[in-house]
Every structure is written in structure tokens, then in C-alpha cells.
């Protein structure tokens, strides 16, 4: 049986690793979290989120104590926002 001390040491190791590598977050559209932003700030997240069609842009936040990630606001799931922007730029695209 694994002792409590071994579990505790493993838990602390995972937290320490997450704090060091917390800027490397992979996209997760379900949670609205896209990419790590440790050291980049809100301007970086706003650009990233707009590339992912977030109507409200984005900000660099700390969704949990061991990770800094871009939080995108109102991601457009059906691409309507993107298509409307294209139609404004290229009126000939209208159906």
C-alpha cells in the first residue's frame, strides 16, 4: 500500500511542475481557455482569442492557482461572427 508520504510528495511535485510550466496550456474550447499566457499579458490573449472567433476578446487570467491561461469571452461556435466580418470586408461574398 502506498503511504501517505509518497502521495503527498507526488502531489507537491505535480504542483511545482505546474507552476514552472504553467504557461504551456493547450487549447480547451469547452472551458473557453486557450493557450498559456504566463509572461505575455492581456494584449496577447486578446489577439489569440480574436483568432479563435471570440466576440468579447480575451484576457490573461488564473483559472486555478497553478496556471495562467488566456480566457476567451463568448467564443463563436457557428462562425457567424467571422462570416459577418468577411461580408463587411468583401460585399461580393453575400449569397
From Swiss-Prot:
Cysteine pairs bridged by disulfides in the record: 37-60, 45-70, 49-72
Compartments reported by the entry: Secreted
Biological processes annotated in GO: defense response; positive regulation of lipid catabolic process
Residues in LCN-type CS-alpha/beta domain copies: 23-91
Cellular component annotations (GO), alphabetically ordered: extracellular region
Tissue expression pattern: Expressed by the venom gland.
Gene Ontology molecular-function annotations: ion channel inhibitor activity; potassium channel regulator activity; sodium channel regulator activity; toxin activity
Signal sequence interval, chain numbering: 1-22
Keywords attached to this entry: Disulfide bond, G-protein coupled receptor impairing toxin, Ion channel impairing toxin, Neurotoxin, Potassium channel impairing toxin, Secreted, Signal, Toxin, Voltage-gated potassium channel impairing toxin, Voltage-gated sodium channel impairing toxin
Coiled-coil segments on the chain, per record: none
Superkingdom of origin: Eukaryota
UniProt-listed InterPro entries: LCN-type_CS_alpha_beta_dom, Scorpion_toxin-like_sf
Family matches, as PROSITE patterns: LCN_CSAB
Family designation: Belongs to the long (3 C-C) scorpion toxin superfamily.
Domain comment, as recorded: Has the structural arrangement of an alpha-helix connected to antiparallel beta-sheets by disulfide bonds (CS-alpha/beta).
Function: The homodimer inhibits HMG-CoA reductase (HMGCR) (32% of inhibition produced by 0.6 uM), a glycoprotein involved in the control of cholesterol biosynthesis. The inhibitory effects of bumarsin are seen at much lower concentrations (0.6 uM) than that for statins such as atorvastatin (5 mM) and simvastatin (10 uM). In addition to inhibition of HMG-CoA reductase, this protein lowers cholesterol levels by inducing steroid hormone synthesis via StAR, and by increasing reverse cholesterol transport mediated by the induction of ABCA1 and APOA1. The heterodimer non-edited LVP1 induces lipolysis in rat adipocytes. Induction of lipolysis by LVP1 appears to be mediated through the beta-2 adrenergic receptor pathway (ADRB2). Intracerebroventricular injection is not toxic to mice.
Quaternary structure, from the entry: Homodimer; disulfide-linked or monomer (edited version) or heterodimer of an alpha chain (AC P84810) and this beta chain (non-edited version).
This protein's name: Lipolysis-activating peptide 1-beta chain
